[in-house]
C-alpha cells in the first residue's frame, strides 16, 4: 500500500492544453521538453490504453533520470488511437519486464478471476452456474435477453452486489444491431427512467436526454467547468476538465437557460449548454471498448451471434475483468466458447519494437 503519493489522470497532469482545446498533439501541451514534469518516478497504470501520440507527449515531457514504470495488461484491448505501445515495448526485449501470473486470492473465492485467467489462456469455461459471482443465462432470443437484463438491473443485482441500478453496467461488443448499444440504451431508458410529469427532457439529434438518465462523456473537454456545491448551493470546490469515459447522472434540464446539468463522481456537477450535448451519450449500455480502464460492481454481457472480427478473446477478457463483484453473461454458450478460441484480433502493423531494438544496438 502506497500513501502520500500524487495520482492523476494523464489528461489532467500531462495534457494541459494551451490554445485549441481540441488539439491533442504535442504542440498543444503545456508540459513538454521546455516545461517538463517534475517527478522522480512516474507510474502509468492501464498502459494498454496509451497510444503512440500520447506516449510521445509523455516521454517528451520527462527529464533524463526520471524512472518510468508501466503497468498494464497486453491481453486487454489495444488503445483506440494508433499503435500497440505496451505490446511493442515488451516484445522489443530491451526493457526489464515482470509478468504477474499467480492468483493470490483463494481459487474458490472469485470465479471472475479464475475464469478471466481461463479465457486469457484459451481454456473453456464451465458454465454450470454453481459460481457465486459468475453466471451464465442461456438465451437465443434478443427480446428475452433484454427482458432478462431489465429484471437483473431492477430486481436482482442491486441487492446481490449491494449497489444501485446506476452501478450495474451492460457491456456489449457492438453499437449497432439488436443487441447493440443504441437499441439497448433506448429500451433501458424507457424501463429504468420512464417519462413522467415534471421530469424534463431534451431531444438533441438522434438522442433523447431525460432528467435521471445515466450518461457518458464521449470526448475530452479541457474547458468545461465543474463545481461541487453543498445542499444549500455553496461552492466548496471547482475546476475544469471532463474526460472521455466519465459517467454521471443528469440532475437537471433547464429549458430557460438551455442547459443540462450532469453530476459525476465526487459530486462534481457540470452544466452543458445545449450545443455541447453531442459530447454526451446514454450509458445504461456501453461498448466493451468504452469500458476499458473502468470497473463496476456488476456487469451484464449480452452475447449472440455477431461478426467474427468483433467477437474475439481479448474483447471477452476485457469485458469480464471490468467486474468487481459479479459477471452475468446472457446469450449463446457456443458464441461465448467460440470467442475464447478466436484470437484473430485485428493486427496492427507497427514498427516501434523494431525501432527500439535498432536504437539499442
Task: List PLM regions with ranges.
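Single conserved hydrophobic/aromatic residue that forms the stacking wall/gate
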Residues: 1-8
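Structural motif
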Residues: 41-43, 171, 216, 300-302
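C-terminal accessory regions
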Residues: 121, 237-240, 244-361
Amino acid at each position: 500500500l502506497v500513501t502520500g503519493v500524487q495520482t492523476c489522470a494523464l489528461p489532467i497532469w500531462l495534457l494541459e492544453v494551451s490554445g485549441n482545446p481540441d488539439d491533442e498533439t504535442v504542440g498543444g501541451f503545456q508540459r513538454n521538453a521546455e516545461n517538463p514534469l517534475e517527478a522522480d518516478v512516474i507510474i502509468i497504470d492501464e498502459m494498454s490504453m496509451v497510444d503512440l501520440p500520447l506516449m510521445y507527449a509523455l516521454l517528451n515531457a520527462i527529464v533524463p533520470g526520471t524512472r518510468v514504470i508501466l503497468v498494464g495488461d497486453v491481453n486487454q484491448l489495444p488503445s483506440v488511437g494508433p499503435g500497440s505501445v505496451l505490446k511493442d515495448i515488451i516484445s522489443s526485449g530491451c526493457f526489464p519486464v515482470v509478468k504477474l501470473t499467480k492468483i493470490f486470492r483463494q481459487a474458490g473465492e472469485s470465479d471472475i478471476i479464475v475464469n478471466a485467467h481461463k479465457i486469457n489462456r484459451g481454456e473453456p469455461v464451465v458454465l454450470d452456474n454453481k459460481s457465486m459471482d459468475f453466471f451464465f443465462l442461456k438465451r437465443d432470443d434478443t427480446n428475452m435477453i433484454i427482458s432478462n437484463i431489465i429484471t437483473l438491473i431492477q430486481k436482482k443485482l442491486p441487492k446481490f452486489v449491494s449497489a444501485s441500478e446506476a452501478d450495474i453496467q451492460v457491456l456489449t461488443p457492438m453499437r449497432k444491431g439488436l443487441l447493440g448499444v443504441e437499441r439497448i440504451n433506448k429500451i433501458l431508458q424507457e424501463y429504468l427512467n420512464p417519462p413522467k410529469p415534471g421530469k424534463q427532457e431534451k431531444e438533441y439529434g438522434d438522442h433523447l436526454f431525460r432528467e435521471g438518465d445515466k450518461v457518458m462523456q464521449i470526448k475530452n473537454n479541457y474547458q468545461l467547468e465543474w463545481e461541487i456545491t453543498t445542499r444549500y448551493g455553496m461552492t466548496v470546490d471547482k475546476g475544469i476538465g471532463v474526460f472521455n469515459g466519465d459517467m454521471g447522472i443528469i440532475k437537471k434540464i433547464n429549458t430557460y437557460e438551455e442547459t443540462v446539468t450532469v453530476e459525476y463522481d465526487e459530486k462534481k456537477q457540470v452544466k452543458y449548454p445545449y450545443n455541447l450535448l453531442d459530447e454526451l451519450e446514454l450509458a445504461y449500455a456501453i461498448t466493451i471498448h468504452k469500458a476499458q480502464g473502468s470497473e463496476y460492481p456488476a456487469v451484464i454481457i449480452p452475447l449472440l451471434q455477431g461478426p467474427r472480427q468483433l467477437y474475439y478473446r481479448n474483447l471477452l477478457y476485457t469485458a469480464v475483468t471490468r467486474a468487481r463483484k459479479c459477471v452475468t453473461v446472457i446469450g449463446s454458450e457456443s458464441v461465448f466458447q467460440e470467442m475464447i478460441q478466436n484470437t484473430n484480433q485485428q493486427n496492427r502493423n507497427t514498427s516501434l519494437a523494431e525501432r527500439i531494438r535498432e536504437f539499442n544496438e
